[in-house]
């Protein structure tokens, strides 16, 4: 059954309806419309945990999308999928690519920080204190930038920075 017929999530349906209206009203090229359609399908598949399908749609959207800002969100969402799959190195690559195109993407900065923090915890478990300190410092740097861009977000990160004297 096509995704459009089985999507019963109200928010996804609302987003889809609004997106369809905007695509019809705004002066956009066919290429831009196609790119956005693939992006929207990718988001829908991702929200349902269908990551392979989401990736296929995101890669198609990326092939068509020329706007750097819009591409940043495609890269970011691909990074989210790799994070969910435990592929942290690949996720970092995509988060960095998102930031190259849109340096004001606090959620990408936050996710990079989360990965470095996780790696720092792993280093502690493996008895690698120096490596853990370096990883925690990197996490702190990314969290500080994310918080600078979105001061009311990332409360847990703000608390961690205070508790570890890294603020």
From Swiss-Prot:
InterPro entries the UniProt entry points to: PSI_Ycf3_assembly, TPR-like_helical_dom_sf, TPR_rpt
UniProt xrefs under Pfam families: TPR_1
Keyword RNA-binding: no
Positions of TPR repeats: 35-68, 72-105, 120-153
Cellular location(s): Plastid, Chloroplast thylakoid membrane
Keywords assigned: Chloroplast, Membrane, Photosynthesis, Plastid, Repeat, Thylakoid, TPR repeat
Swiss-Prot/TrEMBL GO biological process terms: photosynthesis
Coiled-coil boundaries: none
Similarity section: Belongs to the Ycf3 family.
Function according to Swiss-Prot or TrEMBL: Essential for the assembly of the photosystem I (PSI) complex. May act as a chaperone-like factor to guide the assembly of the PSI subunits.
Name of protein: Photosystem I assembly protein Ycf3
Gene: ycf3
